[in-house]
């Protein structure tokens, strides 16, 4: 299963938040700031937008998400070392689930 973290943030100059949060899977950052730009590497994508609001940011993240399993999170989350395994196994145990809260 393909896991993608969808993370909303503000005024991030780079993608260092990914390392700070201990995210090891694919990640999409929606960065609310004063410019409209995009950045992509092998596992990190960052869309900088002038749109404001957490709901707008999360909706944009869902629109551009590519993961089979998507995790919406805040920019102050720190992920456990085995989060990918735990989440993927939960969806394997509950194949009909659309949403699982952790």
Feature names for model-found ranges:
Residues 1-26:
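N-proximal low-complexity "stem/linker" segments adjacent to membrane-targeting elements
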Residues 10-13, 30-36:
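Short, polar loop motifs at secondary-structure junctions
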Residues 15-18, 35-45, 82:
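Acidic helix N-cap motif at the loop->helix transition within catalytic regions
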Residues 23-29, 39-50:
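Active-site regions of enzymes building and remodeling cell-envelope glycoconjugates
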Residues 49-65:
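Glycine-rich, basic loop-to-helix element that forms the pyrophosphate-binding segment
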Residues 70:
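Short aromatic/hydrophobic "clamp" motif used to bind/position activated sugar donors
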Residues 74-78:
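The conserved acidic donor/metal-binding loop of glycosyltransferases
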Residues 82-102:
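Conserved donor NDP-sugar-binding/catalytic core segment of glycosyltransferases
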């Amino acid at each position: 299963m393909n896991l993608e973290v969808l993370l909303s943030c503000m005024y991030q100059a780079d993608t260092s938040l990914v390392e700070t949060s201990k995210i090891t899977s694919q990640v999409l950052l929606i960065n609310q700031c004063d410019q409209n730009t995009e950045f992509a590497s092998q596992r990190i994508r960052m869309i900088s937008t002038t749109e404001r609001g957490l709901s707008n940011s999360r909706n944009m993240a869902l629109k551009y998400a590519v993961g089979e399993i998507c995790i919406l999170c805040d920019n102050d989350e720190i992920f456990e070392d085995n989060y990918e395994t735990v989440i993927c196994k939960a969806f394997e145990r509950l194949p009909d689930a659309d949403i699982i809260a952790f």
